[in-house]
């Protein structure tokens, strides 16, 4: 235990909480380049082939980001916009790719929840 004199000389540092999306460096989104696009299996009890991409961000981090929606056009060297938000059944996936921005096209034939998949309002 430190003495009073030691505490005066060097005050105690508060314990800082770890950020949930450190790779974004406090920004709402970050641009990045796909290094690899592949599928992974979710944790039990779920079963699927979830589409993910390994993305090298402008902040220097290389992260794994989820590709939401049905079907995508992403491949290696695609430029994407990444936001925070984990995928509960994929361990280590703490980011999502924004559909309809940069090289990631919007989901086709989407009628509901369009804003989450970059789909414009359909013409009447």
Curated annotation (Swiss-Prot):
Its main location: plastid. One of its GO terms (biological process) is translation. GO terms for cellular component: chloroplast; plastid; ribosome; small ribosomal subunit. It is found in: Plastid, Chloroplast. One of its GO terms (molecular function) is structural constituent of ribosome. Gene3D superfamilies: Nucleic acid-binding proteins. CDD domains: Ribosomal_S12. Pfam families: Ribosom_S12_S23 (PF00164). Disulfide bonds: none annotated. With S4 and S5 plays an important role in translational accuracy. Located at the interface of the 30S and 50S subunits. Part of the 30S ribosomal subunit. This is Small ribosomal subunit protein uS12cz/uS12cy.
